[in-house]
Structures are given as C-alpha cells and as structure tokens.
Amino acid sequence: DVARCLARATQHRQRAGQLAVSRAASREAVAHYQHAISQLLSLPETIERKRREAGLQDALGGALAHIAGVESDALAQVHQRVRELSRQTGDVKRQFVAEWNLWHVHVARWEHRRAETVGSSLMAMAESVGDPELLLQALHVEWSTLGPSGQPMATRSSCDRGWALYDP
C-alpha cells in the first residue's frame, strides 16, 4: 500500500539525515529532513503523523542552525512549527524545547522583549507541569534574560531558585 511505502521512505530519509548529521554534513541533513517531511505530509493527518513531523522538524532545526545561523528566520519557523505540533499532540516536553529554542533565536537577534515573553511562557509551562528539570531550564532562561536587561535583584532571585534545584 502507498501509505506504508511512504511511511517507510520517510523513515529511511530520517535515518539518512541522522547519518549526515553524524558526519557533520549539515546541508545534506537538511535536504534529507526536508524531503522526509514532505513525504510525511502526503500521508493522512493523524496525531502520530504530527508527532513524527515534530521529531523531523526538530532534527531539521538542529542541522539548519549550522548552515542558516541561530538567528535565521528559517530556523525560527521550524521551531514555531515544532511548538505548534507539540501543542496539538500534547507533548509538553517537546513544546518546552521548541519554546526554549525560540528564546535562543530571540537572544541571538538581541530581541530582549520577545526573549522575556518567551521566558515567561517557559516559566509558566515548567511551573504548571511541576517538572524540576524544566523549571531549572526556565530559571536559566529567566536569569540569562533578566541580567542583561538591568534587573540585578530579580536575576539574583532567579539564580537562587535555580541553585536550590540544582543537584550535581
């Protein structure tokens, strides 16, 4: 059946992308991941397809950062797509990572207000889930964003909260 063949071809393209990444062949990896995504999108829309696309988009983002730059519009679009798919599938951890990646794009672009907004979203997400690892990452975003914006007391408070969670 055609759908099964496409699903299998998508897996092979994903594996080719992973192999290209392992060999530092970022351009080739991007091409493989983009082809895999395009094949996947020809399959019927299901939650599983959205999950698979989120994983492929995430992998694409990693390779794309190397060739387009962390501040690129193309990379921001990939992270936005992962965030959207993660919301639709209820994958909070992947959504958190996508938001964190968007924060990183905004920091690289010196877009401090946007970085603060994304940081607030990360903090709310981490606190609502109650995951200490996510909370530590959200605090890292918070103190990294507050420090350069001239808020030393808030930065210190955020660092103290993070330090209390840190367990080497």
Language-model segments: which ranges?
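Extended alpha-helical scaffolding segments used for macromolecular assembly and cargo binding
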Residues: 1-98, 105
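Extended non-membrane alpha-helical scaffolds
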Residues: 93-168
